[in-house]
Amino acid sequence: MKLSLSPPPYADAPVVVLISGLGGSGSYWLQQLAVLEQEYQVVCYDQRGTGNNPDTLAEDYSIAQMAAELHQALVAAGIEHYAVVGHALGALVGMQLALDYPASVTVLISVNGWLRINAHTRRCFQVRERLLYSGGAQAWVEAQPLFLYPADWMAARAPRLEAEDALALAHFQGKNNLLRRLNALKRADFSHHADRIRCPVQIICASDDLLVPTACSSELHAALPDSQKMVMPYGGHACNVTDPETFNALLLNGLASLLHHREAAL
């Protein structure tokens, strides 16, 4: 699996791995790269079955497989220890990594994640699946911003959204791959295992997230033994895209604090 690695800003700089959500594209983190690369070696990638890592995914494709293939790619690149920043599905992969490779994951940042899918989130995905079956890739892509962004943010950026729709349609991961990745997301359940995660965790959520209620992050916070929760008042599901200044400040402070906390505990 292909990874994109930034040059380390100094010798032995900590590694931060960015894992996007259901869309799977490493470009999702574009507005975080410049600030992170000043302090960390940053790894981003297109998830298997998407972008520059094309593949046909098995029907039983799982979050555990997503975690294993990423860890194997990191080890092959010479990376043994890394912090994880995961958004939604990416946060699930991050938790799986922390469970399966505890000696490797130093810190976990969960952005609009959850322990198990909430009934509201499941309903949103059911609607989106119906759109996919009835209207194909174009209907899925055109509806996606409604679940990602605040209404006023979208209204002020109509030309940008039209360009993003065209790009997303051109690079659509394919109906079968999308549904198999979505099914992996829906099957994931960390409610009985989260208390085994021992690395420090920062939980970031947005109070106006239409797709994932903030209660999901509260449940995560209660279940994770070494976690802190930060709530952004604005930004929607893709809060790192819509309000990068606020998000980046939380992310940078969280990474620095938790990495220091971990080193002090060793």
Curated annotation (Swiss-Prot):
GO terms for molecular function: hydrolase activity, acting on carbon-nitrogen (but not peptide) bonds, in linear amides. InterPro entries: AB_hydrolase_1, AB_hydrolase_fold, AB_hydrolase_sf, Pyrimidine_utilisation_RutD. One of its GO terms (biological process) is uracil catabolic process. Its EC number is 3.5.1.-. Keywords: Hydrolase. Pfam families: Abhydrolase_1. Gene3D superfamilies: alpha/beta hydrolase. Induction: Up-regulated by the nitrogen regulatory protein C (NtrC also called GlnG) and repressed by RutR. It is an enzyme of class 3 (hydrolase). Transmembrane segments: none annotated. It catalyses: carbamate + 2 H(+) = NH4(+) + CO2. Belongs to the AB hydrolase superfamily. Hydrolase RutD family. Involved in pyrimidine catabolism. May facilitate the hydrolysis of carbamate, a reaction that can also occur spontaneously. PANTHER family: MONOACYLGLYCEROL LIPASE. This is Putative carbamate hydrolase RutD. The lineage of its organism: Bacteria, Pseudomonadati, Pseudomonadota, Gammaproteobacteria, Enterobacterales.
